[in-house]
């Protein structure tokens, strides 16, 4: 099945189409995971454009929420930052009206959501909808994310002590709302599968499905190396190949040559490299100042880009979001 979103045509694979029908035609809770490039974001976008259900899309951070044209979890549910535990959840009439209108709640980057916040979402929906005995107040919950890529912020202090006393771990799947154990119906960490997670006394269940077809890479050897890194099974040969190709200082570009992109582990290293190359360009520096609206949670640290963007003629620009223009489309990255 294909969909034309502006100038960009999206066609679902068979496994994506099967999952779309599951979340569209049923009220089952679904967790969709998969390696980078398997189409999680594509499926989420397709569902948002095609569903006949009343949905709300949210994510744990401002950047993640912006990417899916949603809200942060804390903004949607009006939850306080930090440990929520058993504290009273205050809800205005406006918040209750919003939460009562939702048929399906979509959460992106679910792996960054901790167990305490997952339970707070459950309690908020039960409370707002007046259905305290039904998980999520009867709302279908569809979650996208990959625990192998992003983890919750590790708890500290009182929050750590609370998590240790009340949960098996701080991961979302150890929240009280998801109790019981995985009961496999086929599938494994390396293949596709539809698994079920029992929900304790309420008898509901979570479908866990892993997308397995990688659309972003076509080189089988490279994909095998990426999988080895992902699962912690790097052999000496793989390590040597990766170190030979990647763990080296790139040469300085020749005059007029475009610099090689450098991947770094910290923002300060990246910013230093970019500032050095920008300063080397001739011409006057121009500053574009952001117009900020909406809730980004914790201020500038959660902005998708700097509030002041410094540019010169000849500077390279990387798109953080796809731009669908009249003349065609420009892709993020």
Indicate residue ranges for each PLM-predicted region.
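Conserved ATP-binding/catalytic motifs of P-loop helicase motor domains
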Residues: 1-333
């Amino acid at each position: 099945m294909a969909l034309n979103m502006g100038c960009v045509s999206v066609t679902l694979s068979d496994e994506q189409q099967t999952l779309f029908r599951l979340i569209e035609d049923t009220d089952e809770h679904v967790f969709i995971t998969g390696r980078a490039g398997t189409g999680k974001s594509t499926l989420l976008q397709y569902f948002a454009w095609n569903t006949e259900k009343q949905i709300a899309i949210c994510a744990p951070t401002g950047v993640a929420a912006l990417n899916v044209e949603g809200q942060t979890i804390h903004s949607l549910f009006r939850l306080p930052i930090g440990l929520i535990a058993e504290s009273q959840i205050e809800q205005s009439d406006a918040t209750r009206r919003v939460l009562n209108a939702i048929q399906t709640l979509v959460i992106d980057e679910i792996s960054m959501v901790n167990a305490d916040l997952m339970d707070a979402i459950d309690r908020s929906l039960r409370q707002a909808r007046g259905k305290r005995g039904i998980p999520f107040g009867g709302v279908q919950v569809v979650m996208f994310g990959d625990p192998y890529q992003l983890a919750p912020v590790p708890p500290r202090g009182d929050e750590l002590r609370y998590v240790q006393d009340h949960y098996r771990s701080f991961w979302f799947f150890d929240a009280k709302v998801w109790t019981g154990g995985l009961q496999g119906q086929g599938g494994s960490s390396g293949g596709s599968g539809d698994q079920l997670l029992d929900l304790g006394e309420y008898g509901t269940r979570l479908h866990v499905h892993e997308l397995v077809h990688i659309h972003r890479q076509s080189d089988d050897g490279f994909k095998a190396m990426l999988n080895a890194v992902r699962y912690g099974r790097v052999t000496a040969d793989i390590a040597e190949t990766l170190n030979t190709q990647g763990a080296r200082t790139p040469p300085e570009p020749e005059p007029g040559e475009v610099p090689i992109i450098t991947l770094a582990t910290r923002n300060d290293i990246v910013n230093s490299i970019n500032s050095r190359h920008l300063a080397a360009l001739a011409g006057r520096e121009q500053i574009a100042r952001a117009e900020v609206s909406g809730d980004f949670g914790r201020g500038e640290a959660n902005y998708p880009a700097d509030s002041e963007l410094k540019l010169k003629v000849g500077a390279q620009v990387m798109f953080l979001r796809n731009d669908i223009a009249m003349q065609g489309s420009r892709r993020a990255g």
